[in-house]
Amino acid sequence: MYRLYDVGYTIALDRAATLLGDLGHGRVLPRRGDARAIEIRNPPLFAALGSRELHIGGAVYTALLSAHLFDFGVCSLRLQITALDGLTWPEFSAFGVAMSGMDVSAAQFDTELSALLKQIGPAIERQTVAPLTEDYVVYRIDRLISADASRTVSEQFPNETLAPLLFGDQRPLAASTLRELMPHRFSYYDDDLSVLTWENALVVEPREHDLDVEFVLEFANAQLLELRLYDLQLGAELPALYDRVDSLRARRPLRLSRAFREVLAGLQTHVADVTETVERVENALKVTNDVYLARVYAAALELFREQAWRHGIDRKLTILRETYSMLNGEALAARAELLELSIVVLIMAELVLSLSKFL
């Protein structure tokens, strides 16, 4: 279970590693062979935060808490809960549904985040926790007890079998609905499977230490959080800007040039910050070839509608740039009018002084 936060403008990961001390466990990169198709400019920092006790369905589970810190200002908290051995598929589905619906409150995650930020605060530029978070659940299976060797794992887990786990639906879903809800299924070997949905994913991977699929899904969620956050901020910025401009026009009609100066400076800085951050987020992970992990990552971005969020941000940035040009033109016009008025006043004063000599 993942919960991702935006905690600041940037995080100096080397500095954060020093501040974490023994809790820090270095940078994280995909390990499998096809990971060569993915380039990560500044790999996230991993921190092991210890174990926590959770109560699920009347049973007590020990969960491992960890964090990934991304240089573009995101902190991802991960709560890893191990199911009991020997569960049947219906039992595992019930466990997964109970886990995803358990009462791990926002306040509990916030408490864990606050403790972490106390340690790494000096490494964060412009530290502030944004009100927006991103949640995602990954169901992981390392071993199938009664696997059918004559069929691939993908064949053993058709969509209708996965629906109760991934969507919580106990009634059979129509075949057309299943195709629409689960279009993203991937297998690299016969014994692995990754199925992605908007809120969660199933990963069947017999190599216990191979967490590469989870890594790229987490990375995609971190990027989604940043895009959603800046889209939200820009959406709030536009009406606030219009209200401020209207107020300045009403209160200072003769001094618009000076009144708009602060607005223009702030607007220019904000547009530059958003543009730089969005580009840094999108360039944090680059796909160089069409292989397994790259396809999983691309599917996650498509599923999370990354392009739609980016288009929304670009549209709002265009409006802000056009507003900047309009206000700048209006300020220049106001300055020119004031200059013309000053010239007229000087001419009138000169005429008055000249006439006064003959009176």
Task: Locate the predicted segments by residue.
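Exposed alpha-helical structural elements
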Residues: 15-18, 108, 112, 161, ...
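Short Lys/Arg-enriched alpha/beta "domain-start" segment
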Residues: 1-192, 197
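Extended, charged amphipathic alpha-helical segments
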Residues: 163-259
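N-proximal short alpha-helices
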Residues: 50, 57, 203, 207, ...
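Short, surface-exposed linear patches
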Residues: 98-102, 217, 224-227, 343
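Membrane-associated alpha-helical segments
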Residues: 229-231, 237-351, 357
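Short, surface-exposed, polar/charged, turn-prone segments marking secondary-structure boundaries
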Residues: 104-108, 224, 230-233, 302-304
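Short, flexible coil/linker segments at or flanking structured domains
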Residues: 58, 63-65, 184, 189-191, ...
